[in-house]
Amino acid sequence: MTWHHTSLSRLLKIEYPIVQAPMAGGITVPKLVSEVSEAGALGSVGAGYLTSVQLDQHIKEIKALTSRPFNVNLFVPEKEVSISKEDIQTMTGILKKMNMPVHDVSFTNETSYSNYEKQLEAVLLNDVPICSFTFGLPSIEAVRELKQAGRIVIGTATTVEEAILFEERGADVIVMQGSEAGGHRGTFNDSADACIGTMALVPQAADALCVPVIAAGGIADARGIAAALILGADGVQLGSVFIPCTESGAPAAYKAKILSSKEDETVLTRAFSGKYARGISNDFIQKMKPFENSILPYPVQNELTKRLRSHAAKELNAENMSLWAGQSLRLINESMSAKEVLDRLIAGVNDVTESSRKDVNASGS
């Protein structure tokens, strides 16, 4: 059996057990998602910040471009977010003193949950084959409805305990997100400080779970893929390598920072969204360090910085962008199409596994 014939590739009906990470915020546009799926991997829509109408349009565009499987990722809403007006005014004042554009907070728990419910409805109505979840457990009813409709459910976990909760909830696959991963930490079970790395997390999860495991975090080349499979993963999820792709919706300044940054330039920060996320350090993150205790919980902080991030993208100002990226940045130094990225990864894993096989045969002769 070759390396790409795994329980994950069979379950998801994909040729290679490689998942393009569902990066929210405009990166995973339909062209990128469809090109990844067309190349034999699994394209993913990061739908966390999309309205249900926008998601519906994305899904329809992807289906017009490919008949292959793809995934839609949803952010499970916070159970209860209670913030005083005084706290919001304090953070608003801090941002304004920095001459940062501030977005009026329109968030309520009710509107957040309502959009999430409508997103789920869009997934079901449009026959999306795979639905993944981040930031928490979907309801028992949501999982039941998806599975009764024949959809595959994927959970995101940062500890074995979180993964077990997802498996018990009915998830068919679990993404084990190591602390090296770019973007938001998928933590939801009071373990934000654990920061377990991919190499330590994957084998422990593989031993504890009955469902397939996807390794995520710091994987950016063929060696990382091969290592994850050896550690017990049934597949891998890569994000940062797809940000500079020609099909990616990331702003040019963001792509340039990915291609020019090093592994020691990423940090975990709450400055932009109120949740810990790994990204390339910039002026905004550094300016916010003295005000760490005033940063508001997600999604309120995320609402406040919405205009800042939008303005930075338009102005191509990387110093005020949320430049989410993982720790393997030295391995990403060339802009290619999604197909070229995947072709290189697949050929590389073929070479690595063939070389290992020859080494084993030679040592046994």
Which residue ranges define each predicted feature?
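Active-site entrance/lid segments in N-terminal catalytic domains of soluble metabolic enzymes
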Residues: 1-191, 195-208
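Conserved active-site-proximal phosphate/metal-binding subdomains
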Residues: 95, 184-190, 194-214, 219-365
